[in-house]
Amino acid sequence: MKKKALRKDFYMEIRKSMGRFLSIFFIVAIGCAFFAGIRSSEPDMRYSGDAYFDRKNLMDLQVISTMGLTDEDVEAIEKLDGIEKAEAGYSVDALCTEGDNQIVMHVMSLLPSMNQVQVENGRLPEKSDECVVDADFLSKSTLKIGDRVTLSSGTDKPVTDSLKEDTFTIVGSVSSPCYIGFQRGSTTIGSGNISAFLCVPEESFCMEVYTEIYAQVKGAEKLTAFTDQYDQRIDSVMKEVEAIKEEREKARYDEIVTEASEKLADAEKAVSYTHLRAHETDSYL
């Protein structure tokens, strides 16, 4: 009897304040729908991002060395059990004038198959003095396809120590799987912040050694990026790479010392020969 009276009173209260009841009902319904949408969008975003990374053959690991990297380093990494494939590339940060501003661009070489860029407008570079530029940057910049950009090193060394040319023609705009956010990284030149990336053919660089090696991990493509399973797989292979770190560092150090010693020996021979010629000339006179 009490329950029946309570129920009757409950319905009467709703009828008396139907507007307030409906307001609360719809607020709760919208909140539940919004929460359900947020919960379902997170895995959808993961799967979409992972599918995009797989299509563009995005690397799983990046190896960088201050002493530079060689073909022997690439081979050593490819021989590891957990590595599917490795490719080496070049990169350098350079200053570029855009309107009245001087900005920093991250110049990198296009790889044979990994980290494939998506052409948004124009085409990919076909010559060593052609380039493609960050699409997000180009859409807001005074620069456009067909313009020529001149780069400088921002240091006391010329940019031509790294690049064969210092001026490039923009032939397209691209997006890269390496940059999925708005930030482009930091640098030691200019303002300290990189404004955009610029891609050129590998032959545009004149460096003797690579600046980085990109590697793909066996089995990683079947896993969803940014998940615990993916991170654990990458971490396990990272330990394999770190295990050969000292060996490869020593090999590279010895190579640098040997090259320097050979150059020193050649210079000493040249000096000795010059002294000998000078002595012979004095004797003749």
Whereabouts are the PLM-identified features?
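Basic-flanked hydrophobic alpha-helices used for secretion and membrane insertion
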Residues: P43-S283
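N-terminal Sec/SRP start-transfer signal
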Residues: M1-A36
